Amino acid sequence: SAASDVYKRQIYGNSGLGKTHLLLAIGQTIRHNNPSAKIAYVKGEEFVNQMVKSIGTGTAENFRQKYRNADLLLMDDIQFIAGKDSTQEEFFHTFNCLYEAGKQIVVTSDRPPKEMKRLDDRLCTRLEGGLLADVQPPDLETRTAIIRTKAAQFGMILSEDVVKYIAENITCLLYTSDAADDTPCV
């Protein structure tokens, strides 16, 4: 139903636009509002590796429960599971389990589901059935404001010419995703 589709979200866009930062902020907000919430965060590549390891060590059920018992599942860079059939199958069932229980699922990727080559059709349909958020690079005015703000945070005084030059020549401002270390890496 449309009301329950808000439980499924995908944030997509090019690298360096803050998708991971948004994903972590969602997790922090849920944790702040509900300290007992079970939040599972995993990168797509880690999900693949953990699944393979759990099969090899006979702990697949523990792996499943780790994610299926979450109140909120955050998966960063879901595109890394595309083309990995058994991993996609596992994630599909995990997704369904959480969705049917009314739990929240938020994923990030570098492109929308339909553009992910070798993404299982069923999984693509599930992802497209929720809210899709396309993160775009900031415009010139926004980049200028970000540069001024960051310069001030670091105690730097930049002339308007320097701010303008940076804003016009760097269209994507990259920051580390670690909220504790918001150091620019432009």
Annotate each predicted stretch with a short phrase.
Residues 113-126:
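Short regulatory helix/loop adjacent to the ATP-binding pocket of P-loop NTPases
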Residues 130, 144-157:
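Conserved AAA+ ATPase "sensor/coupling" helix adjacent to the nucleotide-binding pocket
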Residues 89-107, 122-125:
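Conserved catalytic/switch belt of AAA+ P-loop NTPases
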Residues 2-7, 179-182, 186:
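Short, small-residue-biased leader/transition segments that mark boundaries at the very start
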Residues 40-69:
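Short glycine-rich substrate-engagement loop in P-loop NTPases that contacts/grips substrate
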Residues 130-141:
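Conserved AAA+ ATPase "SRH/arginine-finger" region at the nucleotide-binding site
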Residues 157-169:
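Short conserved motifs of the RecA-like P-loop NTPase core
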Residues 8-22:
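Walker A/P-loop nucleotide-binding motif
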